[in-house]
Structure formats: structure tokens, C-alpha cells
């Protein structure tokens, strides 16, 4: 099959931001101007095309990453609109993993907010080039340059304005393009479709010249010949500046900044021009690398070409009530077509590709073929999980998977009636497969089912989906903190598991040493020499240890951040088995942890409260009373932003308390920051409750 649009004219981008910065509205305008949507959907009407789940339309927030395709100036743009609410961080994570570029949307009044920082860090981790759009320039308190300064202070970025706003707040009427030297003003009667290009306003000329000089100096360094030309006193042409900005953006040396008001239909077409001009095509990014599943030392490069063997990543699963199981798939090399057989190299199983769909939010177009660089939805991959690699069986390769955040909050859930019992288990299993940051586990002591997630809203929406999509009714307990356990000292365990009861017995012997491994999770080192434990019994010891760590020795919470070294052991020719060594591993770790001064850990949250000045004292006093540590404060227009770190256990019900303390005028955001040791007295209470 041949492509209708060459790869160099394709863009895979994400739109990312803090909640309420205007991401979905910006995406809606993009769809309107590119001709996909004939009517502009407004988020506050509950009619936005990209927010298509019922809960999204009711709450006015984006929960899942809707994927859509549109065209602009002979380019194809695949857009993923990601949620800005911290409870849905996994959606942002999995989108950034498969994108080539991103548009970061900022609120011109609030500037860089906590979730903006989280998303920015995620984009840094995946090396995603980005451009910025300072939105809501028409709102009271909008300040473009303060927003740019905050990008330097909080994001450690190198923002370079490509536009300047003409006016602000209710006088905002357009932008000055620093490259073309034109003022662009948008026609309100045509919803911004029509716009005029004029000369730079006289009162902005000095600012224009100053900022244009800064732009040229920042990007000329990308090209030695152009730098010489510039230093020699010659003017750079528009084409030369655009070429330099593109190189610098893709190299992540600068972040071009644009501005506008998506809701007022101002500044979106120049933003689309920038996506095409400055963000990379699949050919511009570093070639994807993976490893050979049969030889982990061997790196396999997957060049972005349809002629190469297939390699792609499943980055999202979704259950469609009409079609069934959808797997969202990014192809890095090769092609995929309906009917072909692919290898899931993560599981080692083969799968048959059913139908292929190109998604437009919740509408879909059936296609027969997709090639390197494409993002499509596949029907029929029954065994696939998020993060799995699909490839050509003749060239197996495993691509790097996703970073899955650990849940910090859990609730007990039970079916309302006997009829709901089986349906509840099946529905929870389906939802856990779709969303890797959502976990389901059984509490062996109480017999309860616990569901765990990234926050109260995350779990609320899961329970809501059980009723709406699966017609399952469930009772939900009060939220509980997802505590963890760890060790503070090193220890050793010499464990023998011997069972003799007629017939074949059981024999396993392992000596392990454990030590704290702060922030690095679980690590297993096999230091066995001379075959004192045969090779085939090493993995069962490791598995036994990991399974035992799911329920800690203090209060049954998962044990984390431990390095285990298997140093010695012995076996019996007849009585040793994988099962015997599995049991030995599990007994050894419990014994070793008991000796290693175990402690309880609790999640600490980053909290930002924006409050009117007159309530500042009450807000600060309340945070201190919740064991909070204030990190910094910042004055905003008529209000103060307070940032603090507070234990999650102290934050339940905070929204209601804050509303009553400030007459509903303060707002707050909260996201997980790190785990920290629980003070001894409180730890005793938690352990007693569990005991």
C-alpha cells in the first residue's frame, strides 16, 4: 500500500497541561479550523468532541486520552488530548511514550501550575520536543511575560517567544509574529477563521525589535553558517529563522512560545502552523531501539520505514460496547494490515490482527493498512496488555515499556447483590487491564476486595464506570491510604524448608542478605557460585520473595525498596523442586525483614492552595494542623498560592473543609510526591487497626 501523505509531512502530537488551562478547548478549535468538526464543541456545554465519555461531559474534564486525526496545509496531524487532572497521570505517561512532539498549554493568569510541572517532567523523561501556547490571554490578570518567566524558574526550560500579545485581558486583540514581522488580528464574526495581517503597532515597535533580536540570537547558534552570517551583520531571512527554530526545537535546546485565547478563537491557526513548522515528523526523532528477547544484551534498532520488519507498542486498551476490545498501537517500523499474524514479544504469544481503525475521538474510520509512524486502533488483539510490543515473528524485539505509577489510595468494594458478584470480578479485571495505574487485590485476612488508584476522583470514576458500562452495582468503603513497608537495616536469613510425609518430600535451602534500597524498588542479585543451588531453582526463590513482599510483616502492606542477594544454599537430588524453593524464598524474606528494623511508609502529597489574601492565615494554620510543611508562597492577583507537602492520610475531606474555611473561594490541587516514614506513634495506631 502507498501512503497518501509522506512521512515527513506527518505529526504525532499530544496536547498537555494542568487541569483547566484550556487543553480540550484548544483541541476543539484545532478540529474546527482543520475541518474535522463543523460545529465548535464547548467544554462548559458538555459537548466537546474529544471529551466523549459521559463522565467527562458531566465533569468538564478529560479522563482518557482521546486520539484523533486531522489535516493542515498538506500535513496529517495525529492529536492526543491528555487529561490534566493528576489522578490520570498514567494517561499522560502513555501518550508521551508514543508521541513525537507536544503542545504544552498554560493559563496566562495562573502560569506554571503543579500539574504543568509533572507533565513537563514526564515529557523530559521521554525526550519529547514541545512548543508552548499561553492560553486565556483575554482573562483578567493575564500576563504573558510572567508566564514565560515561570517556565524558566519552575520548568528550567529555555522559552523563546515567537509571538507577542497585542493587548491583554479584555483588550487582547491579536498577536505580533516575531519571524514575519506582522501583526495578526482575528475576525470575531467568522469565529476567527478570517484574520488580517497588519504592520506592527507603533507603540509595540521597541518591544518587537528587542524580542526579535533575542529570538534570532537564540536560534542562530543552531547553524554555523547562519551564525557567521548574523555576526557579519547580515539579516537572516524568514526561511532561515524558521529552519533554525525547527532544528533548535527538535534538539530540545529551546521551547518556542505562542499565545492566544482558544475560547475566543484567537491564535489557534498560527499554533497549527507552528506544529507543522517546528515539531518533528516520525523521521526526525531518534530511531526506536529495543532488545532481542532471546538475548537481552543485543540491542535492535527499528528504523522508521514501512519496508522494515514490524515493531510497535500497545499504549492503551479500551473496551468499546459495539466493537469490543480496542488496542491503541504506535507503529515504529514496518507496517500492519488486517488479517496478518503478529508476535506479542512481551508474552511470546502470536495474535491475529482483526480490523484496523483510525480514530476521531469516539468516531472511527476503518482502514486496511497502516505504516511506520502511524497511531491506530487494532481490533482483535485479545491477549495484549498496555506496554506490550507487537512485532514480526521473524525479527522478535521488545521495546521499552511504560513507567506505571504506584497507586496511593485504596477502598474496599463489594457487590450489592449475589447477582453482581461474578459480574463485578469480570468488570474490575477488564478495567485493570485498560488502566495499569488501577489495581485490584484481595485482602486475605478480611476476605475483602480492595481497589487502588491515583486518587479519590480516579476511584470515583472507576465505580461510576462499573454502573454505567457494566451495569454492576457495588458498595464502596471509605478511602484508605496505601501504606508501604520497608527496612532500615541490613540482615541475613539462613532458611531451610524440609518436609517429609511419605513419598517424595520437599527440600529447599537458601541464604539471603537484604539491605535498604531507598527509591530504587526491589532488586534481586544472584550471587550463587559452584551450583550450590541449581540454575532452575533461582527464579522460584526470586518469585517466592516477591510474592511474600506483597504482604509485609508489620501490617500486611506491600514491602518496597529492598535489595536481596542470594548468597548460598543447598538442594536435594530427589526432594528439591521449584515449589520447595519458592516456599523457601518466601520464608527467608519474612525472616530477614523481621530482623531488619521494618518501618511503615506513607504517601506525602504536593499540595497547592490558591486562596484570597484574607483567608491566608486560616489556610496556613489548617495545613500545619495536618502535619503539613509549607514549601513556598507566591503572591498572585488578589490571592496567595501556598505550596506544601502534606501526608495523604491528613487530606481526606480537605475539599469540604477548605470550602467552609474560605466560603468556597479557595481552590487546591494535590499530587503524589514521595513516600516517607510514618512517625512512630501514628505507625503504632495504623498497625493496631490492621492487627
Curated annotation (Swiss-Prot):
Domain tr-type G residue range list: 8-283
Source superkingdom: Bacteria
Record flagged with keyword RNA-binding: no
Gene Ontology cellular component annotations, sorted alphabetically: cytoplasm
KW Transferase (keyword) present: no
A molecular-function term among this protein's GO annotations: GTPase activity
Protein name per its UniProtKB record: Elongation factor G
Amino acid at each position: 500500500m502507498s501512503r497518501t501523505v509522506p512521512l515527513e509531512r506527518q505529526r504525532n502530537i499530544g496536547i498537555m497541561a494542568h487541569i483547566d488551562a484550556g487543553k480540550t478547548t484548544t483541541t476543539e478549535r484545532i478540529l474546527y479550523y482543520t475541518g474535522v468538526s463543523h460545529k465548535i464543541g464547548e467544554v462548559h456545554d458538555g459537548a466537546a468532541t474529544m471529551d466523549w465519555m459521559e463522565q467527562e461531559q458531566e465533569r468538564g474534564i478529560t479522563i482518557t486520552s482521546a486520539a484523533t486525526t486531522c489535516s493542515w496545509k498538506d500535513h496529517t496531524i495525529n492529536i492526543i488530548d491528555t487529561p490534566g487532572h493528576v489522578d490520570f497521570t498514567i494517561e499522560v505517561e502513555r501518550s508521551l511514550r508514543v508521541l513525537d512532539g507536544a503542545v504544552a498549554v498554560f493559563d496566562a493568569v495562573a502560569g506554571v501550575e503543579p500539574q504543568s510541572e509533572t507533565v513537563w517532567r514526564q515529557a523530559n523523561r521521554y525526550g519529547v520536543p514541545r512548543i508552548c501556547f499561553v492560553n486565556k490571554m483575554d482573562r483578567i490578570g493575564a500576563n504573558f511575560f510572567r508566564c514565560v518567566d515561570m517556565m524558566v524558574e519552575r520548568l528550567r526550560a529555555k522559552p523563546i517567544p515567537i509571538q507577542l500579545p497585542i493587548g491583554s485581558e479584555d483588550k487582547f486583540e491579536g498577536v505580533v509574529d516575531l519571524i514575519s514581522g506582522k501583526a495578526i488580528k482575528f475576525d470575531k464574526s467568522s469565529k476567527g477563521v478570517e484574520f488580517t495581517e497588519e504592520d506592527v503597532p507603533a507603540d509595540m515597535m521597541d518591544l518587537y525589535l528587542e524580542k526579535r533580536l533575542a529570538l534570532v540570537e537564540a536560534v542562530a547558534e543552531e547553524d554555523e553558517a547562519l551564525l557567521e552570517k548574523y555576526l557579519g551583520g547580515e539579516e537572516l531571512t524568514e526561511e532561515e529563522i524558521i529552519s533554525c527554530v525547527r532544528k533548535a526545537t527538535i534538539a530540545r535546546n529551546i521551547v518556542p512560545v505562542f499565545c492566544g485565547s482558544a475560547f475566543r478563537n484567537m491564535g489557534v491557526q498560527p499554533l497549527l502552523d507552528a506544529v507543522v513548522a517546528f515539531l518533528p515528523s516520525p523521521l526526525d526523532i531518534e530511531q526506536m531501539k529495543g532488545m532481542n528477547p532471546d538475548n537481552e544484551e543485543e540491542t535492535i534498532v527499528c528504523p522508521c520505514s514501512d519496508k522494515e520488519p514490524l515493531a510497535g507498542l500497545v499504549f492503551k486498551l479500551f473496551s468499546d460496547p459495539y466493537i469490543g476490545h480496542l488496542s491503541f498501537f504506535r507503529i515504529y517500523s514496518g507496517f500492519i494490515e488486517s488479517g496478518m499474524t503478529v508476535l506479542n514479544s512481551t508474552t511470546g504469544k502470536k495474535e491475529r490482527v482483526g480490523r484496523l481503525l483510525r480514530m476521531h475521538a469516539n468516531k472511527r474510520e476503518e482502514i486496511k493498512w497502516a505504516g511506520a509512524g502511524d497511531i491506530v486502533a487494532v481490533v482483535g488483539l485479545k491477549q495484549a496488555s498496555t506496554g506490550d510490543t507487537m512485532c514480526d515473528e521473524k525479527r522478535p524485539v521488545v521495546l521499552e515499556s511504560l513507567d506505571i505509577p504506584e497507586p496511593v489510595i485504596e477502598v474496599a468494594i463489594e457487590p450489592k447483590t449475589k447477582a453482581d458478584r461474578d459480574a463485578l470480578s469480570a468488570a474490575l479485571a477488564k478495567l485493570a487491564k485498560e488502566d495499569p495505574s488501577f489495581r485490584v487485590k484481595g485482602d486475605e485476612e478480611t476476605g475483602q476486595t480492595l481497589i487502588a488508584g491515583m486518587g479519590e476522583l480516579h476511584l470515583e470514576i472507576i465505580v461510576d464506570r462499573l454502573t454505567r458500562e457494566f451495569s454492576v452495582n457495588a458498595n464502596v468503603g471509605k478511602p484508605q491510604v496505601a501504606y508501604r513497608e520497608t527496612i532500615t537495616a541490613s540482615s541475613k536469613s539462613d532458611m531451610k524448608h524440609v518436609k517429609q510425609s511419605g513419598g517424595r518430600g520437599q527440600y529447599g535451602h537458601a541464604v539471603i542478605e537484604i539491605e535498604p534500597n531507598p527509591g530504587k524498588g526491589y532488586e534481586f542479585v544472584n550471587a550463587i557460585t559452584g551450583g550450590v543451588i541449581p540454575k532452575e531453582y533461582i527464579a522460584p526463590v526470586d518469585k517466592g520473595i516477591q510474592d511474600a513482599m506483597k504482604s509485609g510483616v508489620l501490617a500486611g502492606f506491600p514491602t518496597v525498596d529492598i535489595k536481596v542477594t542470594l548468597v548460598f544454599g543447598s538442594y536435594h537430588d530427589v526432594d528439591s523442586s521449584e515449589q520447595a524453593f519458592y516456599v523457601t524464598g518466601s520464608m527467608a524474606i519474612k525472616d530477614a525483614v523481621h530482623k531488619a528494623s521494618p518501618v511503615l511508609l506513607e504517601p506525602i502529597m504536593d499540595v497547592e492552595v490558591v486562596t484570597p489574601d484574607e483567608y491566608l492565615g486560616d489556610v496556613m494554620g489548617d495545613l500545619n494542623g495536618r502535619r503539613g510543611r509549607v514549601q513556598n508562597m507566591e503572591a498572585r492577583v488578589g490571592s496567595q498560592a501556598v505550596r506544601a507537602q502534606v501526608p495523604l492520610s491528613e487530606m481526606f475531606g480537605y475539599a469540604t473543609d477548605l470550602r467552609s474555611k474560605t466560603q468556597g473561594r479557595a481552590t487546591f490541587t494535590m499530587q503524589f510526591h514521595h513516600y516517607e516514614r510514618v512517625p512512630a506513634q501514628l505507625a503504632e495506631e495504623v498497625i493496631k487497626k490492621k492487627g
